[in-house]
UniProtKB/Swiss-Prot annotation:
GO terms for molecular function: ATP binding; ATP hydrolysis activity; ATP-dependent DNA damage sensor activity; damaged DNA binding; single-stranded DNA binding. ATP binds at G63, P64, E65, S66, S67, G68, K69, T70. Pfam families: RecA (PF00154), RecA_C (PF21096). The keyword Metal-binding does not apply. It comes from the Bacteria. It comes from Gluconobacter oxydans (strain 621H) (Gluconobacter suboxydans). Coiled coil: none annotated. Keywords: ATP-binding, Cytoplasm, DNA damage, DNA recombination, DNA repair, DNA-binding, Nucleotide-binding, SOS response. This is Protein RecA.
Length: 345
């Protein structure tokens, strides 16, 4: 039998059974430009290589406690709302601070919030929201707090080996197809644990088994690397984000920015740092200059000057975005072990 006829027969049979478009040649597939949502950080948008977080994909953000995971996720929600999107937050940790979210630019009145009792309930709500196709961004905070119902109903000393990992694996198998079809960005926040008895390599691992590592298109490792002080008072954290996995662009880029208390990611700080990296802003000693005009002695003074002169800040931002290709190469780092002690694939 002729192979071409056999193939056409098989294709038409598949289309009759599963609907038009269920199978097609790659060349026939409509080319869709990656639709992204900004992270709220110019540097991280550049480091991701596509200008933000991709819709229709699963993203994992992990790191130690108080490293900025929820802050980064809330910035993404705020950016999606600015574009007129619908956003949801599944607060499994029951720890969302509405006042802080509002300060970061999130419209609390339109935010869909769920505080589920058990892991199964949280993931069922997530699946229903994604299937609706009406939600643009969904954040689950956090994987570690998705406690299986059997564990909640059992006694304190009971052993529940592998229940959490099985729950995550099952949920992600269901979610991954609907996430792609509905074009929803799903962000899982995750915590770090230490593996016992690791002599060599990185003892850190993330909770919830291995499924999320495989299903995530992007994995971000976020760490607090220092404190920002105003005289003796701590007013913020210096934060480093490393792209440990990226299916959309080259991984292993990292970016540093300031997270200021009550303000979130410091845009002015990023403009200075990226401006210096891209030779857009000149730094001579402690002085910062732009187009031969001095803008401040010391980083905090220069940041304040840019806040007071938004037209200059927007011009620096425009030039930084124009130099995104050059800057993304400057953000490249060597592959390092991720939270499992192995380089990401």
């Amino acid at each position: 039998m002729d192979k071409t006829k056999a193939l056409e027969g098989a294709l038409s049979q598949i289309e009759r059974a599963f609907g038009k478009g269920s199978i097609m040649r790659m060349g026939q597939r409509p080319k869709v430009e990656t639709n992204v949502i900004s992270t709220g950080s110019i540097g991280l948008d550049i480091a991701l290589g596509i200008g933000g977080m991709p819709r229709g994909r699963i993203v994992e953000i992990y790191g130690p406690e108080s490293s900025g995971k929820t802050t980064l996720a809330l910035h993404v929600l705020a950016e999606a709302q600015k574009k007129g999107g619908t956003v949801a937050f599944i607060d499994a940790e029951h720890a969302l601070d509405p006042g802080y979210a509002r300060k970061l630019g999130v419209n609390i009145d339109d935010l869909l919030l769920s505080q589920p009792d058990a892991g199964e309930q949280a993931l069922e709500i997530a699946d229903t929201l994604v299937r609706s196709g009406a939600v643009d961004v969904l954040v689950v905070d956090s994987v570690a707090a998705l406690v299986p119902r059997a564990e909640l109903e059992g006694d304190m000393g009971d052993s529940h080996v592998g229940l959490h990992a099985r729950l995550m694996s099952q949920a992600l198998r269901k979610l991954t197809g609907t996430v792609s079809r509905s074009n929803t960005l799903v962000i899982f926040l995750n915590q770090i644990r230490m593996k016992i008895g690791v002599m060599f390599g990185n003892p850190e691992t993330t909770t919830g088994g291995n499924a999320l590592k495989f299903y995530s298109s992007i994995r971000l490792d976020i760490r607090r690397i220092g404190s920002i002080k105003d005289k003796d008072e701590v007013v913020g954290n210096q934060t480093r984000v490393k792209v440990v996995k990226n299916k959309m662009a080259p991984p292993f880029r990292q970016v540093e920015f300031d997270i200021m208390y009550g303000e979130g990611i410091s845009k002015m700080g990023e403009l200075l740092d990226l401006g210096v990296k891209g030779n857009i802003v000149e730094k001579s000693g402690a002085w910062f200059s732009f187009d031969s005009q001095r803008i401040g002695q010391g980083r905090e003074n220069a940041k304040q000057f840019l806040r007071e002169h938004p037209e200059m800040a927007s011009e620096i931002e425009r030039r930084i975005r124009a130099e995104a290709g050059v800057l993304s190469d400057a953000l490249m780092t060597d592959p390092e072990p991720d939270a499992d002690g192995t380089p990401e694939d």
